Amino acid sequence: MSNVLVLKSSISGNNSQTNQLVDYAVEKLQGNNIIVRDLSQQPLPYFDTVAAIAVRGEPKTIEEKQLLALSDELIEELKNAQTLIIGAPMYNLNIPTQLKSYFDFIARPSVTFQYTAKGPEGLLKGKKVIVLCAFGGLYDEENLVTQYMKSILGFIGITDVQFVYAQGIGFGPEAIEKAQASAKNKINEIVAAL
């Protein structure tokens, strides 16, 4: 049995094409220890100056200490997971702010990455990630969602990342059905190889 961390970030709930893919992947991974964190239904605090001080400095106030405890909890979940399922829909060419906040809280110097003479080095190695993306249009792999997810995951040491796309969902019901079927087939292939 494997530990699986699932991150949902779509604001569209059950109507979300990305969430439908995430739910499908979770169903295929039953029998594992699965933790689901819905960043839209249970949003993290906005990563502001207080949060930055809390996770990168010396927390002094009660609020700073609470934010550090939250960061520690998120990082512990991440460290314990062998596999991550991340729902990353495209909103205005980028990931949802809820997902960006998550990465702001878990990207911590000397905890999930360290600075070296050769540049930053990620400390969370050996994890597998499946990123599930629904796009209204058709995009190549140079899109900002894919590039950001590769970059931020690599920054913390995670390089075994596979992407599953449901593209063209903005073209109507037939396109949605086709995109979902194609994405689910890809999920089946990836899960079978885990």
Swiss-Prot record:
Molecular function GO labels: electron transfer activity; FMN binding; oxidoreductase activity, acting on NAD(P)H as acceptor; oxidoreductase activity, acting on NAD(P)H, quinone or similar compound as acceptor
Reaction(s) catalysed by this chain's protein: 2 a quinone + NADH + H(+) = 2 a 1,4-benzosemiquinone + NAD(+); N,N-dimethyl-1,4-phenylenediamine + anthranilate + 2 NAD(+) = 2-(4-dimethylaminophenyl)diazenylbenzoate + 2 NADH + 2 H(+)
Annotated FMN binding sites: S10, M90, Y91, N92, L93
Keywords: Flavoprotein, FMN, NAD, Oxidoreductase
Cofactor: FMN
EC number(s) given by UniProt: 1.6.5.-, 1.7.1.17
Cofactor notes: Binds 1 FMN per subunit.
Record function comment: Quinone reductase that provides resistance to thiol-specific stress caused by electrophilic quinones.
Oligomeric and partner information: Homodimer.
Family classification: Belongs to the azoreductase type 1 family.
The protein's name: FMN-dependent NADH:quinone oxidoreductase
